[in-house]
Design a protein with these regions (language model features):
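N-terminal secretory signal peptides that target proteins for export/translocation
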Residues: 1-15
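Short, low-complexity disordered leader/linker segments with a strong preference
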Residues: 7-8, 26, 30, 34-35
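Enrichment for repetitive, rod-forming helical segments
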Residues: 10, 20-21, 102, 255
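Short alpha-helical segments used as structural interaction elements across diverse proteins
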Residues: 10-11, 29, 245, 276
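Residues at the start of alpha-helices and the adjacent loop-to-helix junctions
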Residues: 11-13, 27, 201
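Bacterial N-terminal signal peptides
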Residues: 17-29
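Transmembrane beta-barrel domains of Gram-negative outer membranes and organellar outer membranes
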Residues: 35-288
Length: 288
């Protein structure tokens, strides 16, 4: 028990160091007056995955009904810094997802995992970090799009929290913004290219359609379910949630913020996967 507590404490320190590093980096980058923008402009930029705006979202996902008995709850906090760079007529949008994962104790893990004994206890730590670069035209048009490479880095601090594989593949996003709507979709396909031979290969599709309806005073309705397919699974490949929620653009002092809350029900789910999910997001906005 003491050894386990020391391991969890060590994992927590690593995560705190990561958060401190991200925070310090962003503080140095954004240590200047925030550009004034209207609430309408901020909402449009916050809802556009390839907008040329610095931002720091903290997205917390609660997954209920996981495990063989569908009575356990997992949690994933995604730290997702967005850094845009303009090069000539193009914007290069760097989007990072660093997941901090709590996985409850389960009698068995996913059927593709060989080391079933690892799921007899709970795990908390850093998962695999995803890094995506979108190349998007800097000139505005009715159809906004971006395309580029995506990489999954084997950074997990515990075996059940990651794939142990370096994976890569294409990513793309397309959207249109006929006021007051923002409608689009994001897609990514990853394949493992390097990693231990005793761990399952990775071939995973991620599809995220999103619809936003903007209203007065920064309020909006949103639906952005994350649909995934594990092509390596022999059955129950799809995770298909449906749902949505609401959000608001606001300011704390001079700092623009974006907060949202969504709830989802899973109409299809992998073996031992979730039955429902709640997603809460708080996003710091740094207009240029």
């Amino acid at each position: 028990m003491m050894k386990r507590e020391r391991c969890l404490a060590a994992d927590l320190r690593k995560i705190l160091y990561l958060g401190a590093t991200v925070g310090l980096t962003l503080a140095l980058m954004f240590g200047r007056a925030v550009a004034e923008q209207s609430t309408e402009d901020l909402a449009a930029a916050a809802q556009n995955p390839v907008a040329a705006m610095y931002s720091l979202p903290f997205q917390n996902n609660i997954y209920g009904g996981v495990g063989p008995q569908h009575n356990s709850t997992a949690n994933v906090l995604n730290i997702q810094p967005v850094i845009p760079i303009t090069v000539g007529d193009w914007n290069i949008i760097s989007r990072t997802i660093a997941p901090i994962i709590y996985l409850p104790s389960l009698s068995t893990g996913p059927s593709e995992i060989v080391e079933q004994s690892l799921f007899n206890k709970s795990h908390f730590g850093l998962g695999d970090i995803n890094q995506t670069f979108y190349f998007s035209p800097a000139k505005a048009s009715e159809l906004i799009w971006g395309i580029g490479p995506s990489f999954n880095l084997p950074t997990a601090t515990a075996t059940p929290l990651g794939s142990a594989k370096f994976s890569m593949g294409p990513a793309a996003v397309a959207l249109t913004m006929p006021k007051p709507w923002v409608i689009g979709t994001l897609v990514r396909q990853l394949w493992s290219v390097i990693g231990p031979s005793d761990r399952p290969n990775v071939s995973q599709l991620l599809l995220q359609p999103f619809v936003n309806y903007n209203m007065a005073e920064g309020w909006y309705l949103v639906s952005s379910p994350i649909i995934t397919a594990n092509w390596e699974a022999s059955s129950n490949r799809w995770a298909l949630p449906i749902g949505g929620g609401f959000g608001k653009i606001f300011r704390i002092g001079e700092q623009p913020m974006n907060a949202s809350l969504q709830a989802f029900d899973y109409v299809k789910s992998p073996t031992d996967g979730p039955r429902w999910a709640v997603r809460a997001q708080l996003q710091f906005l740094f207009p240029r």
